[in-house]
Amino acid sequence: MKTFIKLLTGNLKALTGLCILALFLFVAVFAPVITKHAPDKGTGYPHEYPAFVVKAAKNNPDGWIAKNLATNKRTLMMSRNADHVLGTSRMGRDIWSQVVYGARTSLFVGFGAGILVCFLATFIGVSAGYFGGKVDEILTAAMNIMLVVPQLPLLFIIAAFIGQAGPATIAVVIAITSWAWGARVVRAQTLSIREKEFIKAAEVLGESPWRIIGVEILPNLISIVGASFIGCVLLAIMTEASLSFLGLGDPNAISWGVMLYNVQTSSSMLVGAWWEILTPCIALTFIAIGLSLLNFAVDEIANPQLRSHKGMRRWRDAAQQQAKQTPSNSTPTDTTPQHS
């Protein structure tokens, strides 16, 4: 375990992804502390400029920011207090507060859907791979059906049927439609592990099937389930943003997708309110980059064939260090000459 943690902390992709994810988690947890305005209340004039734009335009009226980012003098006059870090929306809501509280919704949907997907995929995949027979046939048929049905159109249909779905409903819908691929991968790995000698030995000793699954099989699936979980979190966050942007989510909720939906309905880009669309897009981009880097790092550590040259050197150095710490059990060879 120490070797794995050392390799994880020595991986630049993993460190970068963890730092980005930790930043979003910090923002989501301490949202009431780092914001001064309510995200769902109008606390300013419509489309106030961000504070840094207002201050830069006042300090240097002939500068690049004043000429390119603060071109509307009327809006600049309404923003003279510079009270909003990232400006306001068409309804006068603080963009910074919406982004911070939107991180809560996005992470809730992402991790909630990820946990549900991993539970369903692991349970179904392990059951199909270990028990075989009719159980495998039925569960494999269900996997194939879910894989054949296009996921996004199915999501849109279910979300439209439900109506204005909240974050929890969207997480459940994503989980119901996204478990099949992970279950297929887990099933294939379970079929391979089932033929190992330690599984046969456990069966001969009379251990129950569920104990074998919990004690012998599941620990060998941690890397696959972990990578699948990170991928599901990323998929769920992006899917929630897409559904909310298309108007299939709850417009009263605070999320990055709802922010983009409000940008579309209020024609913010037509009036030059670039900050209203840029902020949630940057947030979605960075959370996607962080989770993707973390996913790549987990794959690299778990799968030797995906490791880079630097990764191979880290594994080689760790193996050599572990070999030095392990006492040698070999017996010295007899060098005494034999007389004929």
Model-derived segments and their meaning:
Residues 1-5, 88, 93-96, 100, ...:
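Alpha-helical membrane-protein architecture signal
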Residues 1-118, 122, 263-280, 284-294, ...:
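Gly/Trp-centered helix-boundary motif
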Residues 104-120, 210-242:
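Transmembrane alpha-helices
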Residues 31-39, 129-133, 158-164, 177, ...:
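Short helix-capping/hinge motifs at transmembrane helix termini and TM-loop junctions
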Residues 85, 106, 112-196, 224-226:
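Generic hydrophobic transmembrane alpha-helix motif, especially the helices
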Residues 147, 160-162, 190, 231, ...:
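Glycine-rich helix-loop "coupling/hinge" segments at transmembrane-helix boundaries
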